[in-house]
């Protein structure tokens, strides 16, 4: 899980989800998991 100021989808399988006002990126590739600070 990377915590970043700006999150962007890295590949086609990355999904952007807003949970409790926090942007998250979920992907099959675990290296692509991100969360907005």
From Swiss-Prot:
Molecular function via GO = structural constituent of ribosome
Disulfide pairs? none
Q: GO CC: one term? A: ribonucleoprotein complex
- Keyword Ribosomal protein: yes or no? yes
Q: Which InterPro entries match?
A: Ribosomal_bL36, Ribosomal_bL36_sp
Q: Which GO terms describe its biological process?
A: translation
Record keywords = Ribonucleoprotein, Ribosomal protein
**Which Pfam family is an annotated match for this chain, by its short name?**
Ribosomal_L36
Query: Is Thylakoid there in the keyword field?
Result: no
Name the protein family.
Belongs to the bacterial ribosomal protein bL36 family.
Query: By what name is this protein known?
Result: Large ribosomal subunit protein bL36
The organism is Borreliella burgdorferi (strain ATCC 35210 / DSM 4680 / CIP 102532 / B31)
């Amino acid at each position: 899980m990377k915590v970043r100021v700006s999150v962007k989808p890295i590949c086609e399988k990355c999904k952007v989800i807003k949970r409790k006002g926090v942007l998250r990126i979920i992907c099959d590739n675990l290296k692509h998991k991100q969360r907005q600070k």
